[in-house]
Amino acid sequence: MHDDRSAIAHAAADALERGRADGTLAATPALAGFDGFIDSIIRVVDRRRSMRMDDFDAIGTIPGFAGRVAAAAGKSANIELVVEEDRFGGNGPLYAGALGRLGMPTTYLGAVGRDDASPELLPIYEPFAARCEEVVPLAAPAHTDALEFEDGKIMLGKTAPVQAVTWERLVERVGLEGLRARCARSRLIGIVNWTLCGGVQGIWEGLINHVLPTLGEQGGEAAGPKAPRPEGMERRRRVFIDLSDPAKRTDADLRSALEVLRRMDELVPVTLGLNLAESERVARVLGVEAHADAPSLGESLRDGAERIRARSGFACIVIHPREGAAAAHRDGAGAWFEGPFTARPRLSTGAGDHFGAGFSFAQVLGLPLEQCLAVGCAVSGAYVRDAESPDLARLIGFLRDLPRAEQ
């Protein structure tokens, strides 16, 4: 199994090397949207050693933080938060920024503006824009306080500004023909954060009704001879969707969203990316058992991905817990890949977005399913270790020397 893991990772690295060398990667554009957040990366103070701002012991775990909050019931508490840095954020910018850093020509449309009415980019997004081929602000960003712990993170979101991102605003800013042209040249269309952006479902509907039926099958095409592709994994246009933690949305909302995406899949193959909790929720709404008893986590998640895929009707379902990732494809392919989990990440906010970027990046390049999983895990694994998005050289090197999961 470990030898297979290494062989898959090396094969993925070889494929990416070829894609860079023959120009395929540079001729595989992406379009992504539509949110935008400013993420404050925060540690929660447990005990101060002095009043120097960085001289403290942080609360290490989410249960430890929960206990501190619970102890204040019926009383009061003052919990100190130390902002380590402000970063450009939002599921969309993190996803698109990861694609751009890997060398994919990327257009981003989203809530990254100086204010709601301005077409100017907010300065904090300038490093993000430098990774992209084009960035079009649609509104001002929302704000997230990201409380980082050793065992996860708690995201406290203030989402009012991103509600301005709607189908009407999108067409107003880029024009219907401009949107069609951007989609027509894109092999990958990535749409994330349905949960917090009330206008995203309307954008899906607008794309289904006014854009996707007008597109050719392929999207941007690289010149030169093409290597044979596995059945069902050919290089064609794909849509990647990440709902982004729909726990706060009702079952009726989620059922409606899945039905819209089913209609989208009739026009362009849809891949739905889910973390473990999201997969359980989606399975429940669809009326299927997510993860039945199986000899291993990998088998359980692979089987669960296929059950969700079969019931949803989507081209591909990918599930990415911390331990690795599993996927099922319409062509009958199914796979599990053990990830390079680290117990002490330098940064965890954005890990899921980086997995989605890596997986969808590999998918539109035509890699086999298990290699797509390896690339997704490697992009995320490098990101949480380095606290920055990997470029293609870092990704290839990481795949060639992929760490074992830490216990």
Predicted regions and their residues:
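Ribokinase/PfkB-type carbohydrate-kinase core domain
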Residues: 1-73, 82-91, 100-334, 367, ...
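Metal-cofactor-binding active-site regions of metalloenzymes
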Residues: 76
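Short pre-catalytic strand/loop immediately N-terminal to key active-site residues, enriched for Gly-Thr
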Residues: 83-86, 339-350
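Short glycine/serine/threonine-rich phosphate/pyrophosphate-binding segments
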Residues: 91-95, 356
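Intrinsic disorder/low-complexity segments
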Residues: 95, 222-227, 345, 377
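Short, small-residue alpha-helix embedded
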Residues: 99, 281-284, 345-369, 373, ...
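Conserved glycine-rich phosphate/nucleotide-binding loop
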Residues: 337-344, 362, 400-406
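Short alpha-helical functional segments enriched in proximate histidine and acidic residues
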Residues: 383
